[in-house]
Amino acid sequence: MSLRIGIDIGSTTVKVVLLDEQNKLLFRSYERHYSKTRERACETLHSIQEMLQGKQVKLVITGSAGLGVANASGIDFVQEVYATAAAVNTYIPDTDAVIELGGEDAKIIFFGGALEERMNGSCAGGTGAFIDQMATLMNVTVNELDELSLKHEKIYPIASRCGVFAKSDIQPILNQGGRKEDVAASIFQAVVDQTVAGLTQGRELKGKIVFLGGPLHFLMGLRQRFVETLKLDEAHAIFPEDGDCFAAMGAALCA
């Protein structure tokens, strides 16, 4: 029996998955690495050592911070967009587009015909890092920010292109007695606006949309803002059970 391991090393997290020959997920791990990428990946691999004994094992790395680790370790590397596409084509084959938010990047992948990727630039606006910054500004955890957003009554316009500009929008609202619940939802709406307007570049988002990445996996309020903004019903807004580990799963599929 052969097993395949996929490791996705991003800007803030390491995701490790183990697939069997039928592409069934046997193990998954999602952890922050705090810049100790190799150490965190090795610790996770060590924890599943017993599962690998007596098996033929293949391993592939992906992710924005994975190439250096792959080169230093002599392990195969696959670009993240191809890893994600491999997982989507295998597990959700009728997908029209993917929206993926990471720690410091955001991307949209269009399927149907040639694969087309749109990715944000060097600014972390509209990403997990932006959400972390805004939670700190409001003196709450990211989970608390999410819970607050679900009780909102109105949405304020907030710039998400840059944390500095967003802060200049948020502080006056709070100073004037604005509800934290409304500001929290407005922060998520800013992420949605930045992603949709900044990355579609006029191309219509339609059909079945799959949402991937840690922020979209863990934050219900962020999911809600995307679904309402894009006017998606349940059949067209897909949030996979392991959407935070899809790129790692795709890397394993490429092994």
Predicted regions and their residues:
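Short glycine-aspartate micro-motif
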Residues: 2-8, 58-60, 94-100
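Glycine-rich phosphate-binding loop plus the immediately following alpha-helix
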Residues: 36, 113-154, 162, 253
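Short beta-strand-loop/turn "lid" adjacent to the catalytic site in phosphate-handling enzymes
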Residues: 30-33, 49-82, 110-117
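Adenine-nucleotide phosphate-binding core of ATP-dependent small-molecule kinases
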Residues: 166-201, 244
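Glycine-rich phosphate-binding/hydrolytic loop that grips phosphoryl groups
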Residues: 131-132, 238-255
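Glycine-rich phosphate-binding loops at beta-strand->alpha-helix junctions
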Residues: 65, 203-229, 240-244
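Short glycine-rich, Thr/Ser-proximal phosphate-binding strand/loop in the N-terminal lobe
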Residues: 4-39, 43-46, 115-117, 121
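Phosphate/pyrophosphate-binding loops at sites that engage ATP/ADP/AMP, CoA/4′-phosphopantetheine
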Residues: 45-57, 195-207
